[in-house]
Amino acid sequence: MKFFIFTCLLAVALAKHKMEHVSSSEEPINIFQEIYKQEKNMAIHPRKEKLCTTSCEEVVRNANEEEYSIRSSSEESAEVAPEEIKITVDDKHYQKALNEINQFYQKFPQYLQYPYQGPIVLNPWDQVKRNAGPFTPTVNREQLSTSEENSKKTIDMESTEVFTKKTKLTEEEKNRLNFLKKISQYYQKFAWPQYLKTVDQHQKAMKPWTQPKTNAIPYVRYL
């Protein structure tokens, strides 16, 4: 009886030892399997994470690029708008200045015609006539020189003719000459421009006995 109890206890102890050994041998296998699964998951998940990170980075980059392009375009438009406004304002001022200059020069030739339309004495027996021709201040030097030479020649010829004939002036002619002298003295008071004097003096057809004092050509009247 004791022997039977001893064998049962021994069998139970051996069975427990075997179960513990099997459980102990299964535990490393389970641990190894779990570690393998974790490693496999770690090997798979990083790829997914990398793919997610790369795709997210691309999306973020695209979004940043779009935002940067929008900001740059808005800044450029904001910079261009004031420049365009400044250009338009400058153009307006420039156009106003041009219009004022054009209006001034449109009035300027008409202003020059008035002093030139003064009385011109042609002959002592003629009446005072008013010249209404347009004024051209540009006169060539060659024309002036030729006109001076021609006027000197005509004066010399007419003076010689007058002295050869030795004509006597009547009282009416003397009165007319005095009247012309008064007119010339009256117009000497005005400060005429020099170029108007030269042009006006060379365009007059004067006689030696009707020579005014304002003439630039020297003339001595012999009695």
Swiss-Prot record:
GO cellular component, one term: extracellular space
Signal peptide bounds: 1-15
Superkingdom classification of source: Eukaryota
Residues in Sequence repeats: 77-141, 159-223
Impact upon substituting residue 182 to I: In allele C and allele E
Tissues where the protein occurs: Mammary gland specific. Secreted in milk.
A single MF term (Gene Ontology): zymogen binding
Alphabetized InterPro entries for the sequence: Alpha-s2_casein, Casein, Casein_CS
Localization (cell): Secreted
Residues recorded as bearing Phosphoserine in the entry: 23-25, 72-74, 77, 145, 147, 151, 159
Main location: secreted
Any Pfam family: Casein
Keywords: Milk protein, Phosphoprotein, Repeat, Secreted, Signal
tRNA processing keyword on record: no
Function comment: Important role in the capacity of milk to transport calcium phosphate.
Similarity-based family: Belongs to the alpha-casein family.
Name of the protein in question: Alpha-S2-casein
Natural source organism: Capra hircus
